[in-house]
Amino acid sequence: MSGGAGIPDVPAFDASGVRLAIVASTWHTKICDALLAGARNTAADSGIDNPTVVRVLGAIEIPVVAQELTRNHDAVVALGVVIRGETPHFDYVCDVVTQGLTRVSLDSSTPVANGVLTTNSEEQALNRAGLPTSDEDKGAQATAAALTTALTLRELRAES
C-alpha cells in the first residue's frame, strides 16, 4: 500500500555537518534518476550541497558499495528499483538487497536508508519516484530518514 497514507511530516532540520553518501543503481534510468534528484534536493534543503554520489549497475551491487561508503560517511542512502518479473529472481534480489543494507547499517553503526523500490509494476515505481506525476518521493524520504537518524545518533553519542 502506498499513495501517501501514513507518511510523517518531517520538520526542517539542519544536517550541514553530516557527511552524506548516496549510492544509486542505473537500471530503470528514469526512475533512478528521479529518486536521485529527490535525494539531492532533500540533502540541499538540509544544508548538504555536495553529497558523495556513486552509481552502480544494479540493485545487488548497492550493499557492498554502501558498506564501503560507511567508512567515511555519517549516513548513506541506497536508491534503486526492482520490478517483479515472471521468475522468482525478484524475490531473491529484494531479499539480498534488504538484508545486505540492514547488515551494513547494523555492522557499521551508520544509518543506511533503504530507498530501493520493490514494486509489482513499473507504474508503481514511477508513482514513488518523485516525478511531477508521482504521489511519493522515496528518494527524498530515504534521505530524510538517513539524515535525521545520523543526527539522532550524533546526539546519543554526545550524551555518552
Curated annotation (Swiss-Prot):
**Which is one Pfam family of this protein?**
DMRL_synthase
- Binding sites annotated in the UniProt record for 5-amino-6-(D-ribitylamino)uracil: 27, 59-61, 81-83, 114
Q: What is this protein called?
A: 6,7-dimethyl-8-ribityllumazine synthase
EC number(s) given by UniProt: 2.5.1.78
UniProt cross-references to NCBIfam families, sorted A to Z? lumazine-synth
In the record, biological process GO terms are:
riboflavin biosynthetic process
Which residues hold (2S)-2-hydroxy-3-oxobutyl phosphate? Answer: 86-87, 128
According to its UniProt record, which reaction does this protein catalyse?
A: (2S)-2-hydroxy-3-oxobutyl phosphate + 5-amino-6-(D-ribitylamino)uracil = 6,7-dimethyl-8-(1-D-ribityl)lumazine + phosphate + 2 H2O + H(+)
Species for this entry: Mycobacterium ulcerans (strain Agy99)
Quaternary state and interactors: Homopentamer.
Task: Give the enzyme's main class according to its UniProt record, as a single word.
Answer: transferase
